[in-house]
């Protein structure tokens, strides 16, 4: 599959996670098959344009669209256009770049379902969908849901029987730096605070205000994207505190995770990265789709979670409980590694190319 188009979006509303996992998949497709990959995304604040271009992929921008298009989908307004219109824009934008047919279209968007897929059937050989909600119909050849303990019955009536399904963390899309990562036992009480790329609700600062005066903490590493909405405010806060180090769009996240004893962050796609690094987490739920991930990982014994509106009341106790438990028991690292091994990207791409 030499020509591939990806339809995904990022913004302060949506976050950057969809683009990041598509970048991981695109990198592996390029590595294994020398594919040319086009990212088609809507213009928006925080739309990850620079990340896509810096990775060396073709960037194709759609206009900003409308604020709240009428849709029957739970996240239909995220698309900022009716589905059929978006599909035609997608094809037209690629046509203007001299692309009239592709081998594979990858779709990672909660605002897209089977209607969009049908509209682009004459434009592509295969369709690959990334989802984790299981709340809408798909007309695709491949479906990936990397949620821990995901089972086939989740999509029983949502995809055809011919669809190749990649389900569970065995297929988690992680960057190459996590393949073969060797977690080490961490003695110092070092925390990693990381809420994804844009952190529009500024949970980073809310967390830091709660934990910075905990007397038994040795170090706090904070990770934010250069496109984070509140980067200046967080940066100013961190600069005046010796305990805290701010890392902006670092390229050594796996190392930072492996050198931390406990993380505080969202229950999104970085959950699998933390597990590969053997890093337990206090997860803060900030979106409904994170609750399924958080619940399953709490049952596995690798996280505990709180709601975002309970940070002030519950976070300090959760951190204390974890640090006490980790000082007595090393089994938590093994529990994390049982969730995800870090080789999912290779498995997915090998499956596509060998189909």
Model-derived regions: residue spans:
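Nucleotide-activated donor-dependent transferases that construct or modify glycoconjugates
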Residues: 2-15
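C-terminal alpha-helical cap of glycosyltransferases
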Residues: 341-355
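Conserved nucleotide-sugar phosphate-binding/catalytic loop shared by glycosyltransferases and other
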Residues: 35-88, 307-309
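A short, well-ordered alpha-helix in the C-terminal region of glycosyltransferases
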Residues: 328-342
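Donor-nucleotide binding loops and adjacent catalytic segments primarily
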Residues: 189-259
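A nucleotide-sugar donor-handling region in carbohydrate enzymes
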Residues: 139-202
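Acidic donor-binding loop of glycosyltransferase active sites
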Residues: 258-269
